[in-house]
Amino acid sequence: MALTELRIASRRSQLAMVQTNWVKAELEKAHPGLTITVEAMATQGDKILDVALAKIGDKGLFTKELEAQMLVGRAEIAVHSLKDLPTNLPEGLMLGCITEREDPADALVVNAKNANHKLDTLPEGAVVGTSSLRRLAQLRHHYPHLSFKDVRGNVITRLEKLDSGDYDCLILAAAGLERLGFGNRIHQIIPGDISLHAVGQGALGIECVEDKPEVLEIIKVLEHTTTSRRCLAERAFLRELEGGCQVPIGVNSQINNEELTLTGMVASLDGKRLIRDEASGSAADPESIGIELAGKLKHQGAGAILKEIFDEVRPEA
């Protein structure tokens, strides 16, 4: 039976609502007779702002509350930044759709005092704000003379902290800045040879209940095949390494002539050890490429690095 109403669970942050409202508008265009409502809520990751993300714990930090709404029948789908969605989902739920990816790169944002600087020219001891261990480890590897400081809160709050002088610069996702209308604050797109992006960064993931094919049929209009293949390879790589969203694992993926090339990286928190490699194969079988690349990095010592990190940033009781 065709659905007449679709309920979307979403985080209530400004960026999440921009993303969810885009999904809502696109689905309304594709299905004019469908009534779509949004239920916005705060997640654990939204509520705890005085503890580093890695110390809170990793599993479903920004997704668990949304998934609970679907599991009890109060929502049919949930919209996530794909980089926040764990690779192992709760029983009964599935990743139903991956939307077209925007620029997945990290971006440098500076305050007025540092307007003439790029990453390469920041002075010794300049304070870089980031809440991501992935960005932290890679930037420490390339720029050990810089100082790094955790930064939490939504994008607007972070920009206010930057402009008030708490930080010399911030590292943020380019896609998030663009979606919020802050593309003009992007001072430099950080190249992949300096900072590989997060798994799924720049794409949205729509999660849904497994046993409702009518819901899957509705959301599949937003599926972007190229993005989906790239992100499935990236997620398989992350899952095989048993890494979560808050560990120093970075990726880049490209598809050319039906060949998918995946680059992956694991680094120690101090940036002194960084393992990077790539794997290629048929874009029609993306997960096998992610699994192959994870095996390569494990063989080079990635497992030992990740174990050290898990022990070091083990969530506080």
From Swiss-Prot:
The keyword DNA-binding does not apply. It catalyses: 4 porphobilinogen + H2O = hydroxymethylbilane + 4 NH4(+). Its cofactor is dipyrromethane. It is an enzyme of class 2 (transferase). Gene3D superfamilies: Periplasmic binding protein-like II, Porphobilinogen deaminase, C-terminal domain. One of its GO terms (biological process) is chlorophyll biosynthetic process. Keywords: Chlorophyll biosynthesis, Porphyrin biosynthesis, Transferase. GO terms for cellular component: cytoplasm. Binds 1 dipyrromethane group covalently. Pathway: Porphyrin-containing compound metabolism; protoporphyrin-IX biosynthesis; coproporphyrinogen-III from 5-aminolevulinate: step 2/4; Porphyrin-containing compound metabolism; chlorophyll biosynthesis. GO terms for molecular function: hydroxymethylbilane synthase activity. Its EC number is 2.5.1.61. The modification S-(dipyrrolylmethanemethyl)cysteine is found at C245. Belongs to the HMBS family. Monomer. Tetrapolymerization of the monopyrrole PBG into the hydroxymethylbilane pre-uroporphyrinogen in several discrete steps. The porphobilinogen subunits are added to the dipyrromethane group. This is Porphobilinogen deaminase. It comes from Parasynechococcus marenigrum (strain WH8102). The lineage of its organism: Bacteria, Bacillati, Cyanobacteriota, Cyanophyceae, Synechococcales.
